[in-house]
Amino acid sequence: MSLTISSDALTRKVAALFEKCGSTASEAQQVAANLVLANLSGHDSHGVGMAARYVDAVLEGNLQPDATVKIQTDHGMMLGLDGCNGYGQTVGVQAMELAFERVAQHGCCIFSLADAHHLGRIGHYAEMAVERGLISLHFVSVWSRALVAPFGGSDARFGTNPCCIGIPLGWGDNTREPFVLDFATSRVAQGKMRVAHNEGRLAEPGTLIDEHGHPTLNPGVVVVPQSNGKTGALLPFGEHKGFGMAVACELLAGALSGGGTWHHTHDGRRAVINNMLSIVIDPARLGHQAFFAQEALDFIDWMRQSPAAPGTEGMMLAGEPERLARAQRLRDGIVIDDASWKELQDCERKLGLAG
């Protein structure tokens, strides 16, 4: 079962939770709107289903409302930032805004962000960049509980460690919708398994192993502890290739930022801590803006001439599925599964908001 709700009503409902937890009305609205935008974009895994976990993290003292990103090191075009365990949706945006200031001065900014609470959908930060005609690359590590097994391993050793690349397409009056590639280095995001578990759906073959290291289709193995108290694991996408990307994210985002890497036992906290290394570039500063813009469009047009494969509607560029989902869900509403809705209601009762 499920229910359908408008994005505005859902944002108000979730913002009330965060404001009750100590955020200003402005921050509560910003975080809630970011989560709802993930739902609108078709990524329910990163949407309001995370709200209950955020509330628990605040109540445990591991998520700090109204935190502000701090500059730890400053070398002009290079910044080392501390997220101070604040909402990723606010400190992540603050980090990007600092980067935009440095790009205006230097043409490029490289920054590390350590100890931010869950940054949400990383594509949001790439979208911020491409709206300004900038290119951005993001490497992220995840500190919560280990969820993904190394290629050739049989238990979870690290997080879903997403990567994201945003590239503007066109220039001036000939600007098109951008290329925004945002993906977990696991075959699927853990949140998608939470949604599948809540909805009673099976996972695709090759996605999961159980607590014994055997292949399984049961998404619950990475959502709830199994009979022996252990959990299963997600598998990396592309076998050794996705595994290699995940390791790169752990080293670039976790180690390089000062936030840390996975080599410890999870202590049961509900907080999800992200570290991120980001590179933001003004393509015009490389001296080939007009060529870059036209060449990018020519290449995209060339690809679109490929006939659709049997049983498909043809190629889609990264970012297009999200834009289509937003249009449809803004029109028809957002479908929330019963388990996620119950979690929101439980949070309201816990915080004294229930009517």
Positions of PLM-derived features:
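Active-site cofactor/substrate anionic-group-binding motifs, chiefly glycine-
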Residues: 46-100
